[in-house]
Amino acid sequence: MSSTAMVSGDDSLEPTLQSLLDQKTLRWVFVGGKGGVGKTTTSCSLAIQLAKVRKSVLLISTDPAHNLSDAFGQKFGKEARLVDGFDNLSAMEIDPNGSIQDLLSTGGDQADDPMAGLGLGGMMQDLAFSIPGVDEAMSFAEVLKQVKSLSYEVIVFDTAPTGHTLRFLQFPTVLEKALAKLSQLSSQFGPMLNSILGARGGLPGGQNLDEILSKMESLRETIGEVNAQFKDADLTTFVCVCIAEFLSLYETERMIQELTSYQIDTHCIVVNQLLFPGKDSSCEQCKARRKMQKKYLNEIEDLYEDFNVVRMPMLVEEVRGKEKLEKFSDMLVNPYVPPEE
């Protein structure tokens, strides 16, 4: 591996995620990859390591499969709750396909909540729906609501498989456009709408259009702030998870290209499920698979010489529960030493 400017005070890039633990400014960490490559195990394990060096860590799953509950053997939901056995690691699971109606609700008791109580009424809701991607994007507001009200030092996202991941990262931009469009329409037709709504008894929850607009503007500012943070390499990074196979490597390369186009930093790759048969092993299948894996591992190292590439072994047992996750997480910072081949 060649040296790069990304590493300070060292001649080579460590095959670990230690650099993420040392980066004290880091606030947002996305973990993503193709389905079935150990993405959730990696994100849970990274969150465990971060909890050792940070005051408070929030792990969020945006994968509809919601594997966090399975990984820790504990039920998580839409509200952040502490992971059993930790006093500074919390987790939550949100549905990225959450309906816009859940968030653009009808005011009432929630009228003071800029995200849950926008109270837009039928016409404004139709306008919101007309903006591509806004239905999915609105669930991002749920994340912002949690993050804003609870001050976590670092947030780890266990994202959905590759395609969904990148869509999720576009959500702040989609929402900014949606809210800007609604603000523009409302400023043009606001007085007329207010008089029509006044004649009909106003919007649900007794709000007027100006109140709704100010709530939307406050939401837009929050989204803009988060969007800027996502593009700041001091605050945000993306950890790619893959296995040493052609399709997974192809997906990883595509993902890295897209992340670069979104100006999102990525400099760590975790390669899971590697076989390390000993030199006395009689398993021909293991040796053949290892040969194939070495080929793709060499490609990964050639393509990403300025990345921290972490090599994780194929394990005999499933990584589930606090103890096994802690063991796995240790290998993210202390490289696994394979037997001699």
Swiss-Prot record:
PANTHER family: ARSENICAL PUMP-DRIVING ATPASE ARSENITE-TRANSLOCATING ATPASE, ATPASE GET3. It is an enzyme of class 3 (hydrolase). ATP binds at K34, G35, G36, V37, G38, K39, T40, T41, E245, N272. This is ATPase GET3. Belongs to the arsA ATPase family. Disulfide bonds: none annotated. InterPro entries: Anion-transp_ATPase-like_dom, ATPase_ArsA/GET3, ATPase_ArsA/GET3_euk, P-loop_NTPase. Homodimer. The keyword Ion transport does not apply. Its EC number is 3.6.-.-. ATPase required for the post-translational delivery of tail-anchored (TA) proteins to the endoplasmic reticulum. Recognizes and selectively binds the transmembrane domain of TA proteins in the cytosol. This complex then targets to the endoplasmic reticulum by membrane-bound receptors, where the tail-anchored protein is released for insertion. This process is regulated by ATP binding and hydrolysis. ATP binding drives the homodimer towards the closed dimer state, facilitating recognition of newly synthesized TA membrane proteins. ATP hydrolysis is required for insertion. One of its GO terms (biological process) is tail-anchored membrane protein insertion into ER membrane. Zn(2+) binds at C283, C286. Keywords: ATP-binding, Cytoplasm, Endoplasmic reticulum, Hydrolase, Metal-binding, Nucleotide-binding, Transport, Zinc. It holds the Pfam family ArsA_ATPase.
